[in-house]
């Protein structure tokens, strides 16, 4: 797998980056006519690929690759946070490119609307959208030839991917999270396009849940998770539809993303490092939740179970593991300087982190 990953990254940053600015060119996940530029989601996931490759290179003991990939990941992260960010809008842009690309993208949006109208899809809302893009085209015509910057044409949900991935600065993240919730969200989560304000999809709501979780906003993340739960089994028992609440494919593997990932990685706070037989755990219970429990969670060649329960004496944490040779770091905010009971022994915490080993661990954080 690793050799193919290296080939893929090389392809992204050479053949797909003809101007050498580290923003790969081409269509991203959005299926929008004409939106063929340097898109924010592609740039973000390219940055994530570089970061992951730097860690993989360490495992495969390549002497120069870890530093090379890590440096490129850091540069791309900074470029995304500067060149894609529009401070006046308080948002990351749809794409980065030239005024000519912005005009072509807008014309593509108009053509897509006209195709729908010709097919008999006409409504006052569509007419309003058509007028918006025509006015945008007039506005774009005022820019000098060759102007290069970040552009908004659709305000697609992928503007949240820098937050989902955790590479946004905190101030930018909080500002955009609040904006999306207030201005871009419908009944079941973010609109695919905040300009069109029509369709919502499970993937967009999932990304928004993960974005909220990435910046410690547990209750806000669970608000989006609940929107996905509301669509559960609408079309097919035990499944979540692609388009919310009940349209599109009734079964797609990624529709579980917005349920499983926020819960496992944020509420339970489980972060695996399977290669090193290590797991970090930092739970975040939503408001009003007194207990959580997850059983038989596969992690590498191991299986763990983890539970948190608030009691009259304090909060109990129970961790069991199939393997005895794994190591765990349990992080509890505000633990430093307080007493806790670990496997029957009363101790005083020197930090917020507790190291755990073995197959069974029981910890009581004394209130």
Show which residues each predicted segment covers.
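Non-catalytic C-terminal accessory modules of carbohydrate-active enzymes
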Residues: 211-367
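Aromatic- and acidic-residue-enriched carbohydrate-binding clefts of CAZyme catalytic domains
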Residues: 24-37
